[in-house]
């Protein structure tokens, strides 16, 4: 480039001697600035760089950290890698142990091993994740999922995820790739299997509902039996009380008469009824004779 500028300056028309000297100084300064610019480069945070020179190729023993670095222009140029963890989602259809088709989506956090960048560049280039991850994920998923039934993939999801992560991490080490996290984000089955599972769940819920109704009927029956036994015991106690104390029935009739009288007194309507039918005439002989006859009948029983 500097030589081209000098040739261009030589083709310009000749001028005063001072102007020619200034032009030469300007061209020299431009050449120096260009050389300095091409000799310096910066490695940003979270990145690493390796050198490729035009004679020996990739320099295996040089890995440049973050910051400002120098190089020989034209003879060397840097290759910069991003070594931060990057997420990637990979989906793979595979078959379970009971021959059910399963679609699994994994979220993988991957980054290159910084100490192996020269080796990685020679084998895989800069797009290492695109070349490696889809193939090894499919390989590991098929080998792991084939060990479980479709139902076990749901009930033992944590165990399946742990096994996938362990095998995938070991497999990625062969390509100098570090996996910081592997997680199952989606797990789906074929329409036929999903419909069969839903039908089974509905049948189980109906069976549980029927069992609940049977248990409820049994509890209601027991409650009625207990209630009937309680009413029978209460009737027996009343009968015993009548046989031992005839005045108990008279007391009950007096309380009933009081309740009837209170209800009629508080009513806005006025109704005239036979006093005998309302058992309000407590001084009448019929009241006493009626009570005594009931006590006699109860005693005979």
Curated annotation (Swiss-Prot):
Renumbered residue ranges of the record's region Necessary for transcriptional repression: 19-49, 150-174
Question: Any coiled-coil ranges, and where?
Answer: 191-237
Q: What Pfam families does this protein's entry cite?
A: Band_7 (PF01145)
Q: Which Gene Ontology cellular component terms are annotated? A: cell surface; cytoplasm; mitochondrial inner membrane; mitochondrial prohibitin complex; nuclear matrix; nucleus; plasma membrane
Q: Which UniProt keywords apply?
A: Cell membrane, Coiled coil, Cytoplasm, Membrane, Mitochondrion, Mitochondrion inner membrane, Nucleus, Receptor, Repressor, Transcription, Transcription regulation
Q: Does the keyword Signal apply?
A: no
Q: Name one GO molecular function term.
A: protein homodimerization activity
A biological process from GO: mitophagy
Read off the CDD domains from this record: SPFH_prohibitin (cd03401)
Concerning InterPro entries, the annotation shows: Band_7, Band_7/SPFH_dom_sf, Prohibitin
- Compartments where located: Mitochondrion inner membrane; Cytoplasm; Nucleus; Cell membrane
Please state the protein's primary subcellular location.
Answer: mitochondrion
Domain of life of the organism encoding this protein: Eukaryota
Q: Does the keyword Nucleus apply?
A: yes
What binding partners and quaternary form does the record give? The mitochondrial prohibitin complex consists of two subunits (PHB1 and PHB2), assembled into a membrane-associated ring-shaped supercomplex of approximately 1 mDa.
According to its UniProt entry, what is the function of this protein?
A: Protein with pleiotropic attributes mediated in a cell-compartment- and tissue-specific manner, which include the plasma membrane-associated cell signaling functions, mitochondrial chaperone, and transcriptional co-regulator of transcription factors and sex steroid hormones in the nucleus. In the mitochondria, together with PHB, forms large ring complexes (prohibitin complexes) in the inner mitochondrial membrane (IMM) and functions as a chaperone protein that stabilizes mitochondrial respiratory enzymes and maintains mitochondrial integrity in the IMM, which is required for mitochondrial morphogenesis, neuronal survival, and normal lifespan.
PANTHER family per record: PROHIBITIN, PROHIBITIN-2
Please give the family membership noted in the entry: Belongs to the prohibitin family.
Tell me what this protein is called.
Prohibitin-2
Q: What is the lineage of its organism?
A: Eukaryota, Metazoa, Chordata, Craniata, Vertebrata
């Amino acid at each position: 480039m500097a030589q081209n500028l000098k040739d261009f300056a030589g083709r310009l028309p000749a001028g005063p001697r001072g102007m020619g000297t200034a032009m030469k100084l300007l061209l020299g300064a431009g050449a120096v600035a260009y050389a300095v610019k091409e000799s310096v480069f910066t490695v940003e945070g979270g990145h690493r760089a390796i050198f490729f020179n035009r004679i020996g190729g990739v320099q295996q023993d040089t890995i440049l950290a973050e910051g400002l670095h120098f190089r020989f222009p034209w003879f060397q140029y840097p290759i910069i890698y991003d070594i931060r963890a990057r997420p990637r989602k990979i989906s793979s259809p595979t078959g379970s142990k009971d021959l059910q088709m399963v679609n699994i989506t994994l979220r993988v956090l991957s980054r290159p091993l910084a100490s192996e960048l020269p080796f990685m560049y020679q084998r895989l280039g800069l797009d290492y994740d695109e070349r490696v991850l889809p193939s090894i994920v499919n390989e590991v998923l098929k080998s792991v999922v084939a060990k479980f039934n479709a139902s076990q993939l749901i009930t033992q999801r944590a165990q399946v995820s742990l096994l996938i992560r362990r095998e995938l991490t070991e497999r990625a080490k062969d390509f100098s790739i570090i996996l910081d996290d592997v997680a199952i984000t989606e797990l789906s089955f074929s329409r036929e299997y999903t419909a069969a599972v839903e039908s089974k769940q509905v049948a189980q819920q109906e069976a549980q509902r029927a069992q609940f109704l049977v248990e409820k009927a049994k509890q209601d029956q027991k409650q009625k039996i207990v209630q009937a036994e309680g009413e029978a015991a209460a009737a027996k106690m009343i009968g015993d009380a009548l046989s031992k104390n005839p005045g108990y029935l008279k007391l009950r009739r007096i309380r009933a008469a009081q309740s009837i009288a209170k209800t009629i007194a508080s009513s806005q309507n006025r109704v005239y009824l036979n006093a005998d039918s309302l058992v309000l005439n407590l001084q009448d002989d019929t009241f006493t004779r009626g009570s005594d006859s009931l006590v006699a009948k109860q005693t005979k029983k």
